[in-house]
Amino acid sequence: MANYFNTLNLRQKLDQLGRCRFMDREEFADEANFLKGKKIVIVGCGAQGLNQGLNMRDSGLDISYALRPEAIAEKRASFQRATENGFKVGTYEELIPTADLVVNLTPDKQHSKVVADVMPLMKKDSAFGYSHGFNIVEVGEEIRKDITVVMVAPKCPGTEVREEYKRGFGVPTLIAVHPENDPKGEGLAIAKAWAAATGGHKAGVLESSFVAEVKSDLMGEQTILCGMLQAGSIVCYDKLVADGKDPAYAGKLIQYGWETITEALKQGGITLMMDRLSNSAKLRAFELAEQIKESLGFLYYKHMDDIISGHFSATMMADWANGDKDLFAWREATGKTAFENAPKYDGKISEQEYFDNGVLMIAMVKAGVELAFDAMVASGIYEESAYYESLHELPLIANTIARKRLYEMNVVISDTAEYGNYLFSNVATPILAKEIIPNLQKGDLGEPTPAVEIDNITLRDVNDAIRNHPVELIGQELRGYMTDMKRIAVAG
């Protein structure tokens, strides 16, 4: 199999990268009706598999789970999750032949095996679904021509997909139809109904492409969403301890700091996050963000280039073939970092203290979001997609660090995201330690920024620069569709 994106000519590549249309709510008037009365079989019962299935069942759809015989016989976690929630469970041979829609929600590295196993069992003119297009775009999987291939990609972890649905809301979602597999022209109707069944239509749906979803998703998770948070956590903790701060306090400031500051990001973008600072701290955070951009800009664009060319996916798949040797080594090394082993702090840190004592962290968030967004847009990805894969998902990933530090983040995200995270953070961490940390000033991290005389013109220009960055302009528009977003912070 060959990388699908690399088989396209330039015009086709640009067309696929630029597929991005925010769908009107009226387009979902039929909600999930197109799939009602049809048999839907989900392969895989992890976080996305279980929680999407629960939502779809509650929306009136017929859901069952196809698992491997050994998973059933040994009553593995996937079997227990499905049966404990009252779902019908069977083998591929028992359930796939009668399915109208088979939804593959297994990890990326299992997709080719799943396709090889289920495709011969699928009935003529049925449909096959993904929630991430890596297998189609990067692996180049070819699906039988009578089968319709669609994607519904919630822009949140599976647990959040369920929680928002239970609130009567949903999470922003990308949908797509594979242009090589839409024989009856029903792909969009299937994808819309599936998205509605998960609740996504209530938060906003982008009609995208497999290509745009994959390239933007990989870029976001490798850089700002995971890689920057990991690199930032490590260098900020080490700096605080080196400055004589209580290691327990330093650990808590970092662990819960990302979540607290990105909660403001979620509600009002970079503008609101920066507005939580004093004027003196805001000017300093802006200055630090520009320095971080200068140091790390090349790395963001290198990751984007490697994703577009297919170099990243080829490198990762080589590690798959090598038994995930690099992935496991990097995972072990992360577990040994000082931040991961910081003692527990029982004291209280107020919400505002996370902002006042975390100016460098805020600068890292600002620089990282803007760099990731700019790199995606410069590569032909539309602003809406770039926003969802950078700023929008950041509070959700920060929330995982608040639970159990970097370990939890790397457990919750996919192996694909984890591998990309390490590629980025392994390079970014020493750069930040060498070029940014030694030049910090009093008040950049661990204590409030001293008040300085404020020049009105400078403050005006900085505020204008913050508010007029393209990620802020598109973010203000898209957040208008998500006015019911709840707070997710667990900090205390």
Curated annotation (Swiss-Prot):
Entries under NCBIfam families matching the protein: ilvC, PRK05225.1
Function: Involved in the biosynthesis of branched-chain amino acids (BCAA). Catalyzes an alkyl-migration followed by a ketol-acid reduction of (S)-2-acetolactate (S2AL) to yield (R)-2,3-dihydroxy-isovalerate. In the isomerase reaction, S2AL is rearranged via a Mg-dependent methyl migration to produce 3-hydroxy-3-methyl-2-ketobutyrate (HMKB). In the reductase reaction, this 2-ketoacid undergoes a metal-dependent reduction by NADPH to yield (R)-2,3-dihydroxy-isovalerate.
Gene: ilvC
GO MF annotation list: ketol-acid reductoisomerase activity; magnesium ion binding
Classification via InterPro entries: 6-PGluconate_DH-like_C_sf, 6PGD_dom2, KARI, KARI_C, KARI_N, NAD(P)-bd_dom_sf
Biological process annotations from GO: isoleucine biosynthetic process; L-valine biosynthetic process
Keywords from the named record: Amino-acid biosynthesis, Branched-chain amino acid biosynthesis, Magnesium, Metal-binding, NADP, Oxidoreductase, Repeat
TM ranges: none
Protein name as annotated: Ketol-acid reductoisomerase (NADP(+))
KARI N-terminal Rossmann domain ranges (all copies): 14-208
Binding site for Mg(2+) 2: 217, 389, 393
Organism: Haemophilus influenzae (strain 86-028NP)
